[in-house]
Amino acid sequence: MTVGVCYFPEHWSRERWETDISQMAEAGIEYVRMGEFAWRRIEPERGTFDFAWLDEAVELIGKFGMKAVLCTPTATPPKWLVDEHPDVRQREQDGTPREWGSRRFTCFNSPTYRSETERIVSVLTDRYADNPHVAGWQTDNEFGCHETVTCYCEDCGEAFSEWLADRYESVADLNDAWGTTFWSQQYDDFESIDPPKPTPAANHPSRVLAYERFSNDSVAEYNRLHAALIREANDEWFVTHNFMGGFSLDAFRLAADLDFLSWDSYPTGFVQDRQPDTPTVDELRAGNPDQVSMNHDLQRGAKGKPFWVMEQQPGDINWPPQSPQPADGAMRLWAHHAVAHGADAVVYFRWRRCRQGQEQYHAGLRRQDGSPDRGYREASTAADELFDLDSVDASVALVHDYESLWATRSQPLSPDWDYWNHLRTYYDALRARGVQVDIVSPEATLERYDAVVAPTLYLVGDELSTALTDYVDSGGCLLLGARTGEKDPYNRLHESLAPGPLTALTGAQVARHETLPDHVETRLSYDGATYEFRTWASWLAPEVGVPRGEYRTGEAAGNTAIVRNAAGDGSVTYCGCWPGDDLADALVTELLDAAGVEYTERFPDGVRVMERDGYTWALNFTSDPVTLTVPDSTGFLLGESTVDAFDTAVLDGSIRGVGLASE
């Protein structure tokens, strides 16, 4: 386990560098990330390179016993390149070019930009191929940030046509698969299929989904170019990429070309702009632990190995609606939280607050005058406390499908439908019970998991249906959620009623569905108790499945909401609605009991426990102290039974028997 920092020597005078880097070493920092936005400094004009400054910075890092993580600088090409080749810019859906002047405005499919990428990455990696102080590379920076996965330029139009031609035997097959007879949308050839541009009504959902798939494949192909060039120069370097939380960019697609995944964690920002509820005061100070850890578990699950937090919030940040100061202790708390969920490194962004540009109001571990800020002290403390660990061993998987995210986003049927928040309902319920969760793709091998939760497998074909059926037949316990199996992989309704090919497994079909706004009363009964649900309700018609839940309000009253079916040596529960928190807890605890998975009492919001490598972390994201109950045989490596506000304790033992003392 290690701590790192992001550094921008190009922002500071050379006279300061040695002081900065020596102070990093004093703080216990082991890795320094550099160079992601430095293309113009490296190549001030075409073919003229200035490596002296970067050479010196890398040597200083090595001098003080640390390692450099370098980045390919392709997120910010220099002005001279864009002036030479304005065609490298992305275009909005209406054709407006995304202009030079910030970052992430270039097209992944531009042949010119791919050529320029190959040129600068080759020069950089060749330069440092034999440098012992360079440990590895980050490809580019935050693919997809600022809604830039999709581009609608001519290069993308041509590439989209070619992409479709590679995937369909003929345009007639495409017309049949998409159902283009609707509104007379048949195509005569692949070349006539444009990216979906603005239209008076919605674009065809199959076309929209295909363009999402194509766009994500384009990012993956562009990332593959970087990774191949890096490994060609030195196959001992690691290659990673820093994803962002809650993005629709398919991390699973990129994972194959990376040694491990990384992501950028900004808890007080995400809680403001990536969840619908108004943040509590505690969340404004420390974020929501489940929102953050779901991203930890996604980065870990996508590759099946430990991940890095490549940018950890160091203090106040500039980009969310509000810029609250994190609570005292939050920066240390976040480091422990990441490690407990499988991180092998936490890299703080940035070393010093920048004096210029768009991120002047983004804190660093040190202030712009070089004096230490709170983040510096907390990062130093975390560096002293954290230790090496084996990987997280999760017995529960949560299946996350980016393609279902894209498809339901284009046809939500309610302004309140949100794929991520529906996923969070089940994820949060598992985390409140202390359960470690691998977030995996629909293509993942499920047999190693005792229990699997699949909240929204909206697009289901025969292959996925077979995999889920085989999992249950072999003794697995499966929980399916609302909107499961509504569509086929081409985004068409199945010829049979939902859940389509999963009907035999679930033992039920969807007779009707409805969406309801928040002010409508929505209640159901489940196992003799009454619960709330929200937004979505599928009225289930059991065939061989056993009814377990029944709607009690509105037009749905008397219809089945939840069924359970035994299949082979396992079982499946199918919940047709979006459950409230209490119902989600009841569903997951029944699942865990059936699967024999150990879990804790239900912890309150903001207080979480999790186990890694035989140690248990208790993390308090609230402003009130909490007192733990632990077995007599369990000791504390860090902290004690009373965990103060925004503090952590580390127990030398499993989660078994860990709870909260009653008030």
Swiss-Prot record:
Protein's organism: Haloferax lucentense (strain DSM 14919 / JCM 9276 / NCIMB 13854 / Aa 2.2) (Haloferax alicantei)
This protein's name: Beta-galactosidase BgaH
Similarity comment text for this entry: Belongs to the glycosyl hydrolase 42 family.
GO molecular function terms attached to this record: beta-galactosidase activity; metal ion binding
Subunit: Homodimer.
Keywords of the record: Glycosidase, Hydrolase, Metal-binding, Zinc
Documented activity regulation: Requires 4 M NaCl for maximal activity. Loss of activity if DTT or beta-mercaptoethanol is omitted from buffers. Addition of 5-20 mM EDTA, 1 mM Cu(2+) or 1 mM Zn(2+) results in loss of activity.
Domain of life: Archaea
A GO BP entry: galactose metabolic process
EC top class named in words: hydrolase
Reported temperature dependence: Stable in 3 M NaCl for several days at room temperature, but approximately 18% and 50% of specific activity is lost when samples are stored overnight at 4 and -20 degrees Celsius, respectively. Activity is irreversibly lost within minutes in low salt buffers. Activity low, but detectable in 30% sorbitol in the complete absence of salt and it is stable in 30% sorbitol for at least four months at -20 degrees Celsius, but at room temperature approximately 20% of specific activity is lost after 48 hours.
Catalytic activity: Hydrolysis of terminal non-reducing beta-D-galactose residues in beta-D-galactosides
Active site (catalytic residues): 142 (proton donor), 311 (nucleophile)
Catalytic activity, EC: 3.2.1.23
Residues noted as binding substrate in the record, renumbered to the chain: 103, 141, 319, 359-362
Function, as annotated: When overexpressed, cleaves several different substrates including o-nitrophenyl-beta-D-galactopyranoside (ONPG), chromogen 5-bromo-4-chloro-3-indolyl-beta-D-galactopyranoside (X-Gal) and lactulose, but not lactose. Also has beta-D-fucosidase activity. No beta-L-fucosidase, beta-glucosidase, beta-arabinosidase or beta-xylosidase activity.
Induction profile: Highest expression in cells grown on galactose. Glucose or glycerol, alone or in combination with galactose, gives an intermediate level of expression and peptone-containing media gives very low levels of expression.
